[in-house]
């Protein structure tokens, strides 16, 4: 893998973990990041059912990406997302979180990682309404990360924090609408078809 891009950007190359790595979103994180020049997947974590197994065995027939499981991760032993928090935090610079749990459980788990001084970039909706958690589309509102010091004060952390992304449909069209807002656009009709996104997946593998 060519590291020259990351070196040219001030050594932004980072070690990261994926929490919820066996689910569909976790799989997508893997395909996007396994060859990314800025990132190095150091940890894959999932539920106790998958923990302790090589990733290719843990995900098994649930793998639903068009690409094969990347060689870099297929033999990586899956860690326990809820029991290995401190250990995971010590191994990475930050984590991407895509766990499939109840919202209150997700909120608690993400705060545990943050309090272990591990920054969390969350794909989940659990913290989208937490006042001091920034929900960022970098092209639109990068200044929202300025709330992080307040969040750290609440959590009692020096480095750890939580940041979230918006709903997946919004990130597709809002960046295009944003520059049009100055022209006085008042109404927009948007149709999304998220319920169809899993139609090609067989029933046992839907999560």
Which sequence ranges carry the predicted segments?
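Single conserved hydrophobic/aromatic residue that forms the stacking wall/gate
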Residues: 1-13, 199-207
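Conserved anion/nucleotide-ligand pocket segment
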Residues: 20, 164-202
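N-terminal Rossmann NAD(P)H-binding glycine-rich loop of SDR-like oxidoreductase domains
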Residues: 22, 26-30
